[in-house]
Structure formats: C-alpha cells, structure tokens
Amino acid sequence: MATDRPGLGPAFPRVPALSLGSWNTWDRMEFGDAVALIARAAELGYAFFDVAHYDMGPHAEGSTTDQIFGRAVREAGLAREDWLYCGKLWLWDYPNVGFTQQMNTSLERVGVESADVVVVGDYFGEIDLERVVADVAEQIEAGRFRAWGVNNWRIDDLRKAFDIARKRGLAPPVFAQLKYGLARRSMAEGEFYAPLFASGQLTLQASDIFEGGLLVGNLKPNRKIGADVGGIREKIAGAWPTVRKIAAELDASPAQLGIAFCLANPATANVLVGVSRQAQLEDNAGAIALLERVGADRIRELTRELWLDREVAADGTW
C-alpha cells in the first residue's frame, strides 16, 4: 500500500507523503497564492513544510522565502501543532556560525519557537563530526527540534556520526534527504545507503526529484537547481520525452509518475515537491492513487531505463 510508509524516526512514525518546499517555493508566487497553497496542503493532509534560511555558503543570496512562509502559514490560520516544519542547519561556515545561532535566526524569521526536524546540510572538505553530533544533541535537548537527518553526506562520515552518537548516548540521524528520482538513483539505492534503509536505521526523504523541472517538461527552468552530480543534467533533459510517454501510457501526469516512483521505494518516508501553484499540488497529490492503481513493481519496470546516474559514485563522494 502507498500509505504504508516509514516515518522520520521514532519521534515521527508517520509523516505526510508530500512535503512542500525548495529554495524558491514561497518567493515565486503572490502572497495570497502562498496562503491558499498552504491552506490547501493542510486540507489534503500534506501540512509538512521544508523551510530554510538561505544566506550562507553557496546559498548566500539574501532569500526571504522563509519569512514569506512564516507570514503565510499564520495567515492561513494553521495552528502550530497542525503542521510539521523541517529546517536546515548549514555546515558552510560552521562552527564560526554555530547551530544555536543558526536556529535562533531561522526560528525568528519563520516566527515559531521550534522546528520538528532538521536536516544537517552537505559540505565540502572535512568536518568535525564529534562536534556536529554533540551540537545537534544540544539543540534537541534545548527543545529546538526532535529529530535530525543528513543531506547527501558521504557514507563514511555518516557511519562515523552513528558511531559517535552510539558511544556518547546521543541522538543519531534518523533520515537522509537525498537526490532521488527517476533519473538519479545510485545514492539512495546503491550499496552504501540502501542497507541502512533496509535495516530501518535510516529512512529516505526524496529531494530534487524533477531535476528543477526538467523531468516534467520545463526544459528552461527559471529557478535554481541543485548540484549536477556526475554532470548528467543534459542526459536528464533528454529523457523528458520518455517520461512523458510512460506517464501517458499510465493515464497519469509526468509529475505523478515521478512522485509515485519515489514512493514505490519502501524506504521513502516522504517526497519534497517545489510546487508554486495550487494546480501543481492537486496534480502531485494524484501520485498516491497512481501508485495504488498500478503498483510499485510495474512503475519500476516501466521506468527502468530512466536510471541515468549508474556511473555516479553511490557513497556521496564527488
């Protein structure tokens, strides 16, 4: 069943199948449309929002998308206990800008007292894992959030983080937010991360599933797209006609096909979607029915040749 999915650790055994959010979600629409989109997401049971302060490292762009979201969610009338907030902690200027400072800033900008979960972001070079794990635990102890995950971490560092948490009796990461979808599968389904998902040590939060819109036919996206790991973006754009053809065969939209593929993986807790219009949200929600109607095995069979990152390192190294 499409509804039989894992959660994000013991604190969140059930989460919505879809999570709204991306770099530019809330600053790509009129404010009233943002309010209506949030309200409709809650009505559909998808009141899970991935929201971050993007003003550090390669994301130093002075974005206001998080502030817009904070105002919009209040205007939509959602009580804080009725929606889930997934935040970000960045390692780009860590520990110069520590997690306490980052959380203070993020929570103030959104206008809430705490998040529910956070993702500790990706990085270049080496990081002080002992300090990262301890500092995350400090934020959990302070009530800033209840669980944490990692974003595209190198597998060796992730394993070290597990060991540190176990030895020190601290909270380990419970999910991984990974690039995952029709075209990019190597990391989530490869020999390194897949055993962690299979054992239940981690669950998967799928991100970048449409490659910035390329896999739903937007071949000239006007928004930022995540890193092109492996340099395969041109190949991904070239796969669009095949995606469209398979979706048509299933009497579904390309977006529904892409989301259903992610949810067909039993490790997937939920899928991040960067909708900026209510019509997109309504369409995306149809992915659940598609998966129930067609089945995971059939979807994977039909999309087998769309796996385009087979030669990309599965261990998180670039």
Question: What do the PLM-derived regions correspond to, one by one?
Answer:
Residues 29-41, 95-111, 129, 158-163:
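Short, acidic/polar
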Residues 20, 34, 41, 49, ...:
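Conserved, mostly hydrophobic/aromatic
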Residues 123-306, 310-313, 317-318:
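Beta/alpha (TIM)-barrel catalytic core signal, keyed to glycine-rich beta->alpha loops juxtaposed to Asp/Glu
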Residues 9-14, 42-43, 70-82, 104-113, ...:
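Acidic (Asp/Glu)-rich catalytic clusters
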Residues 21-32, 87-97, 121-122, 126-127:
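Active-site mouth loops of central-metabolism enzymes
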Residues 1-81, 141:
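N-terminal binding-site loop/beta-alpha segment at the start of enzyme catalytic domains
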Residues 33-36, 63-68, 100-102, 130-136, ...:
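Charged helix-capping and loop-helix junction motifs
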Residues 108-126:
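Active-site groove signature of glycoside hydrolases
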